[in-house]
Amino acid sequence: MYNPYSLQGKTILVTGASSGIGQSVAIECSKMGASVVITGRNKDRLQETYDMLEGSGHIQIPADLSSYPEIQKLVDECPKVDGVSHNAGIAKIIPVKRISQENLEEIVGTNAFGPILLTQLLVRNKKINNKGSIVFTSSLSGVYCVHYGESMYAASKGALSGFAKGAALELAAQGIRVNCVNPSIIQTNIFKNEGEIISDEQMQEKIQNYPLKRLGVTTDVSWAHVFFLSDASSWITGINLPIDGGYILI
């Protein structure tokens, strides 16, 4: 049966695949027929993701994308791919007056420098096939809105969205498309992992701010990645797609 969203015959590199959105992207890509190359910092959790993939021909390459030598190693070991899904990222809620160089380097380094440098090396080493697709998980923060304490996080994600537009323009000559998905709050462990725990009561309060009256789940984002990685989006490049349950409408 014809399916323009199929990833059959495509090889997709998925970063941040050991948990959260990245894990969901890897799983959904495998369900759509892709051979998936997964990478993440935590070897044990990366193995868990690998075990959940459907089909065969998948590869796992542990790497910390905040380390340039490890980015280089990942590119060396990675086969040629038809798509790249960038999901590695961290979040910390820190007011402006408490920002330090150390946590600025950590957040911007992981959320912006890592994906940008990985993309640069993949392009320079011709690891992305012509007519390929690059998708960045950015954020609603830094592009459409921002919340208290998110200035560093918003800056890192805003940088990523800006880079994606420039890359889309430059790589269009090779038929390579570059897009961003910009989710609002997605129910993952990203805040808990960083010690910024949002209580159930706070979550219920936040839900009331969304016209669709729920928070996002990982597949809300990973299905958008599948769309951008597939031929169904072959004439779309350089955009930021809000995935927010209608949040920016109010």
What are these regions (language model features)?
Residues 18-19:
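Conserved glycine-rich cofactor-binding loop
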Residues 95-96, 103-108, 202, 206:
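Substrate-binding pocket helix/loop in short-chain dehydrogenase/reductase
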Residues 119, 156, 164:
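Active-site helix of classical SDR
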Residues 124, 169-170, 234:
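Alpha-helical segment proximal to the catalytic Tyr-Lys
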Residues 139:
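Residue(s) in the substrate-gating loop at a strand-loop-helix junction
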Residues 172, 177, 236-238:
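Short, small/polar-rich loop/turn modules that mediate ligand/substrate recognition or access, typified
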Residues 214-243, 248-249:
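C-terminal substrate-recognition "lid" of short-chain dehydrogenase/reductases
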